[in-house]
Amino acid sequence: MKRAVVVFSGGQDSTTCLVQALQQYDEVHCVTFDYGQRHRAEIDVARELALKLGARARKVLDVTLLNELAVSSLTRDSIPVPDYEPEADGIPNTFVPGRNILFLTLAAIYAYQVKAEAVITGVCETDFSGYPDCRDEFVKALNHAVSLGMAKDIRFETPLMWIDKAETWALADYYGKLDLVRNETLTCYNGIKGDGCGHCAACNLRANGLNHYLADKPTVMAAMKQKTGLR
């Protein structure tokens, strides 16, 4: 039996990854992280979506220690979420240092326990938000270290790594879940479901990608299929 663990926030990217994983694996487990995030409404959204879509298990892990260590506008109410990013040094204040290091490592431990062969994450370098822990070289390096440390070949999969936001919408549409992803996910840094606040960088990226896709569906769908190998 093929099993996978999806790092699942209930946002556009991870929901699209979950939709695809459910088509490719016999058993899919979701793991969601509570790190005291500003937009912690995503935890309830993730629970609801994982249940609705049919994930085998829906685990929420308490990693609020990260909140104490990582200072970010997503972990501190006193730091405002900016409308546009990145900042002058290239790293936006929404970056949570160490977040994906922790999430992927814990997801791999969970995968080890449930005998899953893959950990799936929705990080992406094409519409790169300036987060160093979304880069392909980082994911590959951590994957190698984790596999060595557990003496087990757990594969980190990044199905969105080389497609842009418009193509991510196309991928959701390919699986017949465009409306679900648009209306029922939570991507907004300010914790607003669906189309979100319309001002933060996450909402900007999401809306621009959707508008691009809706304006030229055939071209974007063809590009997505070419990059992902789907037919």
From Swiss-Prot:
Enumerate the residues binding Zn(2+). C188, C197, C200, C203
What is the role of the protein in this entry?
Answer: Catalyzes the ATP-dependent conversion of 7-carboxy-7-deazaguanine (CDG) to 7-cyano-7-deazaguanine (preQ(0)).
Give the organism the record lists: Escherichia coli (strain 55989 / EAEC)
Tell me its EC number(s), please. Answer: 6.3.4.20
Reactions catalysed, semicolon-separated, are: 7-carboxy-7-deazaguanine + NH4(+) + ATP = 7-cyano-7-deazaguanine + ADP + phosphate + H2O + H(+)
Q: Which Gene3D superfamilies match?
A: HUPs
Sorted UniProt keywords: ATP-binding, Ligase, Metal-binding, Nucleotide-binding, Queuosine biosynthesis, Zinc
Query: What is the name attached to this protein's record?
Result: 7-cyano-7-deazaguanine synthase
